[in-house]
Each structure stands twice: as C-alpha cells, then as structure tokens.
Design a protein with these regions (language model features):
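Alpha-helical heptad-repeat coiled-coil segments that mediate oligomerization/polymerization in large
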Residues: 256, 419, 426, 464-465
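A short glycine-centered flexible hinge/capping loop motif at secondary-structure junctions
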Residues: 250-254, 458-462, 499-503
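Periplasmic alpha-helical coiled-coil/stalk elements that build and connect Gram-negative outer-membrane
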Residues: 60, 186, 195, 202-318, ...
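Small/polar-residue-enriched beta-strand and adjacent coil segments characteristic
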Residues: 34, 51, 60, 72-75, ...
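Hydrophobic, well-ordered secondary-structure elements that form the walls
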Residues: 356, 384, 401, 408, ...
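Terminal intrinsically disordered/low-complexity segments used for targeting and assembly
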Residues: 2-9, 16-111, 170, 194, ...
Length: 514
C-alpha cells in the first residue's frame, strides 16, 4: 500500500510533536534545577596591590558565582590572562652580559637540555587534550558491521520458525549523533582545555628562562673562583717571598725563629685554599656541562674570567608591564582561567544532556537477504539525559571545582607576591652592591697607592722589601673583595633579569664590572 504525502506528513508529525514536547519539558526541568550557592570566591590580586605601578588592568574576581555571571567572570580572567600577549623580553637576554662563551653554552643548553624536552612534552599533551575536546563538539558518525551464525534454543521464547535451527544473521548500520549544547557545556570544556594548553605553552618559556638563569649564575660563580684562584696564586708567591726574606733576616739576626715559623705556616694555608677553589671549580664545571646537555667532564678546561662580563644599569621604573611578563605568572593566570571554566563546566552538569541521534542500515536473518530492499532499517530522534537524584554528587563536584579554582587563584597570588619580593630584593641588592663597590674601589686605590709608595721607598733605599710585601698583602685582599663584589653584581643582574621574566626592554647603560 502506497502512502500519500498527507499520510506521510501525519505519520512524521506525531512523533516530532512528541519529541518537541519532551524537549520543552526537559528544558523546563533543567531551568528549575539549582546547583546551590557557592562560598565567596578568592580575589585575584593585581600588580598594583603589591606596590608596583601598573600599566595593565587585572581582574579581582576569582570565579563565577552564578550561571549568568560565569561567562563574564571567565572573560575577565581571559583579559587578565591576556597580559600574556605582552611581548616577552629579548629571547637572548643573557647576551647583555657580553661573554661569547656564555652565549654558546646557553644556546647549546636551550637546544639539548632534557628539562626543556619535558616541558615541550607537557605542551604536546595539553595540545592533544584540546584537540580531543574540540573533536567531541561536532557530529559523531560511525559504521558497524555484525555477522553471526547462531543456533536458536528450542526452549526459549523464539517462534517455531527459529527454535532449534541455525541461521546466519547480519547487521550493517551507519549511525550519527550530535549533542545540542544549549547550556555552554562545550564552550566551557574547550576554554578549560585551551587554558591548560596556554599555561603549558608559557611554561616552556618559563623553563627556558630558568635554565638560562641557572647557567648564567653558575658561569659567574666559576668566573669568580677563577679570579680568586689567580689572586691566591699571587698570594702564594708573595708569601713564599716573605718566607725567604724572613729566613734571611733570621740568619742575619734581625728576626726570631717565631717569625720564620709564622711565615712557614702561611704557605700550607694558602695551598689549601687553592685546593678548595679547585674542588669548587670542578663542581661548577660539572654543573655547567650538565645544564648545557653535555657529559659532566665536557667542560673540565673551562676557565672564564670576570673581565669580559658586563653589568647593565637597572630599569628606572619597574611597572606591572615588566612584572606581568614573567612566564610563571602568565602560566598561573592561565591556570586560573582554566579552573574558572571547569567551574562553569561543572555547573552545566545540572542541565539536560540532549542529543540528536539517527541510524540507517540493513538487518536480516539470513545473509542472502541482507542487501535486499526489505532489510533496510532506519530511525532518528532526540535522546535526553537529565540528573534528578544523585545523592549530591553533582553539587560535590561543583564545590570541588570551585575549591580548585580558589587553589589556582591562591597559587597565582602567592606567585605574584614571590615575584614582587624577588624584584624588590634584586633592586635593593643592586643599590647596596653598587655602594659597596664605590667604597671598595676607594679602599683598593688606597692600598695600591700604599703599595706603590712602599715600592718607591724600597727602590730609593729608604725602606726594606718586607714593607713592600706587607703592603701587597693589603692589595691582594682588596682584589679578592673586588672579585666578590663583581660576581655579586653580576649574579644580582641575572637574578633581576630572571625575576622580570628575562630582562627588560629599556636600552641599558652598559658598563664593565672592572
């Protein structure tokens, strides 16, 4: 019997009307479902709250408190996280130190260090998760084929035609489904995944800055020890000369054996200092080699000097734009964004899950009829899932996500305070070391002047060589102190560059540390 167009219209209109009615009821029930009230959110601190002049605006809202404000709060966090778009400092910020050997080591480290490979792997994992989340938002289409040979029991509910007989059966079916995202579930899930992906991306930059800073610190420390060793070698020669002079004076009856023994005791002490410096230098060479992705003994011949290293003037103004470029702060901000979206996602679980499903295929008992016109099988309609009674599971999940958002906000606030402290410490140390260097330069000049005067008196026959050696002792002590202050100044410069995320854009007034 052929169906008329009117009959077909009536046949499909009835179930579609029922489906619309069910869908409307689901939306009504979903609108009545309440996730309850959440505790007040933690405030997200801004750079101005820690005493820095801000050039960007940061949000003070941590997470959503109602479904109507979820997207607004997430957008605010997104703008907060958009400070990540502030350009990072010069990628090769360590070049400001002016040592080509250090540049080579850092560049090798950034290409071969396993710790960076781990950060890149975490980024790849987050990217894959984002791709997977995106893939679930479109139509899902599948194709299945089931073939079986079955003997039907004689004592079951099968009709006599089947009972006790063996038949082949086949089912070839294509199916499709599409989730209707009326409540922002897909968007929240995608934004949460994107937040984690962006955090992982920025953490790669943070790992690069940290690696370069650690390598620069070790390099400066090694250069300091090399300088101190050179001074110690000169002290050894000077004390040997002092011992020789003392022995001669004892033989001449001008000094006692006590002075000779004192001079003899200074030699082993100086040699022990040199051995200690050699041991520390070996450890630093091993550290530099491993940081640059090499075997520990690869840099056993490395002996850098403080002379070529340069110290740059600090920025006149450290604003929020500088502090906000720190990769770890940017990553923490993205973690907050992801956590906020997780809260929004947990809230959507209270609303209906509505899908459109459909299938078309062939099904028959007996493979010889599988592809006949009468074996066709098709269907379509909505599928709805609505949580009604779950023992508080969804509310617990929502509160857990809200707590995780608070944890992310707290972690960001702690990181911001730590960053501000690191910058403040570096700035204060910079000024203190600069004042110490000025005073030490005067002390060194005075010691060198006294040494020159003692030498002139000795050459003029007005003084003895013992006075020259004694004056040189003060000069060597001041040179050791100068090396210490030089390395402290360079170390502090690296610390400030790392604290600001890798330097600053201001054109530095570069001066030698010598």
């Amino acid at each position: 019997m052929n169906s008329t167009p009117t009959a077909l219209l009536i046949r499909w209109a009835v179930p579609l009307t029922a489906a619309v009615a069910v869908l409307s009821a689901a939306l009504l029930l979903g609108g009545c479902a309440s996730p309850g009230q959440l505790p007040p959110p933690l405030p997200l601190r801004s750079a101005t709250s820690v005493g820095w002049l801000a050039s960007t605006t940061a949000s003070t809202t941590a997470r959503t408190t109602a479904s109507t404000t979820a997207s607004t709060t997430a957008s605010t966090a997104s703008s907060n996280a958009s400070e990540a778009t502030t350009p990072f400092p010069e990628p090769q910020w360590w070049r400001a130190l002016g040592d080509p050997a250090l540049d080579t080591l850092v560049e090798r480290a950034l290409s071969d260090q396993p710790s960076l490979a781990a950060a890149a792997a975490r980024l790849a994992r987050a990217t894959a998760a984002t791709t997977g989340t995106q893939a679930t938002q479109g139509p899902q289409v599948g194709l299945g084929l089931d073939l079986s040979r079955q003997r039907y029991t004689e004592h079951g509910l099968y009709p006599p035609l089947l009972a006790g007989r063996v038949y082949n059966s086949g089912n070839l079916q294509a199916s499709a489904s599409l989730e209707l995202d009326f409540f922002g579930r897909h968007g929240a899930a995608l934004q949460a995944a994107l937040g984690q992906q962006q955090a992982a991306r920025v953490e790669v930059q943070a790992a690069r800055v940290l690696l370069a800073a650690n390598l620069a610190h070790a390099y400066v420390s090694l250069a300091r020890l090399v300088s101190l060793r050179e001074i110690s070698l000169r002290q050894l020669d000077q004390r040997q000369a002092l011992l020789d002079l003392t022995v001669a004076r004892v033989q001449a009856g001008l000094d006692t054996v006590m002075e000779q023994r004192q001079a003899e005791g200074s030699l082993p002490d100086t040699r022990a200092q040199i051995e200690a410096l050699d041991g520390q230098m070996a450890l630093l060479r091993h550290q530099l080699a491993v940081l640059s992705g090499q075997a520990p003994q690869a840099l056993d011949g490395l002996s850098p000097s403080l002379a070529p290293l340069r110290s740059a003037a600090p920025p006149e103004r450290i604003g929020a734009d500088l502090l906000g470029r720190r990769a770890d702060l940017v990553a923490a901000r993205w973690r907050v964004e992801a956590a906020l979206q997780d809260v929004a996602l947990a809230r959507t679980q209270f609303y209906p899950d509505i899908n459109l499903i459909g299938f078309v295929g062939l099904n028959s008992l007996g493979l010889d009829r599988l592809f006949s016109i009468g074996s066709r099988n098709l269907g379509a309609g909505p599928a709805l899932r609505l949580p009604l009674f779950d023992g508080g599971r969804l509310r617990a999940n929502l509160r857990g996500r809200a707590a995780e958002a608070d944890l992310a906000v707290a972690a960001y606030n702690v990181a911001l305070l730590d960053a501000a402290r690191e910058v403040a410490d570096a700035a204060a140390t910079w000024a203190s070391v600069a004042r110490q260097q000025d005073q030490q330069a005067r002390a060194l000049a005075a010691a060198e002047s006294a040494h020159d005067a003692a030498g002139q008196r000795y050459r003029a026959g007005l003084g003895n060589y013992l006075a020259v050696l004694s004056a040189e002792t003060a000069v060597l002590a001041q040179r050791s102190q100068r090396a210490d202050l030089q390395s402290r100044a360079l170390d502090n410069q690296v610390a400030l560059m790392r604290a600001l995320g890798g330097g600053w854009h201001d054109e530095p007034a570069v001066r030698s540390v010598r």
